[in-house]
Design a protein with these regions (language model features):
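N-terminal secretory signal peptides that target proteins for export/translocation
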Residues: 1-9
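Generic N-terminal leader/targeting and pre-domain segments
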Residues: 3, 16, 28-30
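Intrinsic disorder/low-complexity segments
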Residues: 8-11, 26-31
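Bacterial N-terminal signal peptides
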Residues: 12-25
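N-terminal soluble domains immediately following signal/targeting peptides that reside
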Residues: 29-215
Length: 215
């Protein structure tokens, strides 16, 4: 059995009804997350090089998931820089296995190169959090002349925005079904006309060819 105190485990659950009541009461005058207070939204930006693939992963969590994870985020003292850095490192490593990258059907493992966690103002005086993970394939990986497939298997049970982009850096991406530019600004500016029907792209495929750019 875990040695974590029962009160520490139960606190987020006990706070949730109060949080929901506060958000409902203040909703008309507060700025809510554009996709809803329960959403967990993700963006993967692929940058393909001749001998490596980089993944820029961003996870944007709305107010409810944030307060469940960090009930102290909006209390005096809040979340310390050390706590934020520790969570970011652990969470990026936990998400890494769910990012499936293959070249000609062979899976290429990713390693986390950097991680960051930021808290931003949300609705009713609560925070939302933005997790950023920079990942890269391990060692030298020849990409040219191969079919690349990428699948984000994380958060399959969550509501939210899912977006993947892909660009070539010293290579050309042929028949890519991923856009070259993020239409949400990496989850910072969601298009108003898509708020009721969020983008739900969890996979991308393309052919890597000699050149530079997307064909």
């Amino acid at each position: 059995m875990s040695g974590r105190p029962l009160a520490a485990v139960a606190r987020p659950l006990l706070l949730l009804p109060l949080v929901l009541f506060t958000m409902t009461a203040l909703a008309p005058s507060a700025s809510a997350h554009p996709l809803g207070n329960f959403t967990v939204n993700s963006f993967s930006g692929l940058r393909v090089e001749p001998q490596a693939v980089n993944v820029d992963l961003v996870v944007d969590s709305a107010e409810i998931p944030t307060v469940q994870q960090f009930p102290q985020a909006d209390s005096p003292g809040g979340v310390t820089a050390e706590q934020a850095a520790d969570y970011a490192a652990r969470e990026c490593n936990a998400l890494r296995p769910g990012l499936r990258l293959t070249l000609d059907g062979t899976r290429e493992e990713l390693t986390v190169r950097s991680s960051d966690l930021q808290f931003l103002p949300g609705q009713a005086g609560l925070s939302i959090m933005r997790l950023s993970c920079e990942l890269r394939t391990i060692g030298t990986v020849d990409t040219v002349g191969k079919d690349l497939e990428y699948v984000d298997e994380n958060s399959l049970d969550r509501l939210g925005w899912r977006e993947i982009t892909a660009t070539g850096d010293g290579v050309a991406l042929v028949d890519s079904d991923a856009a070259a530019r993020s239409i949400s600004g990496r989850l910072t500016e969601y298009p108003q006309d898509l708020l009721t029907s969020p983008l739900d792209q969890r996979s991308a495929s393309m052919r890597v060819a000699p050149g530079d750019g997307t064909v």
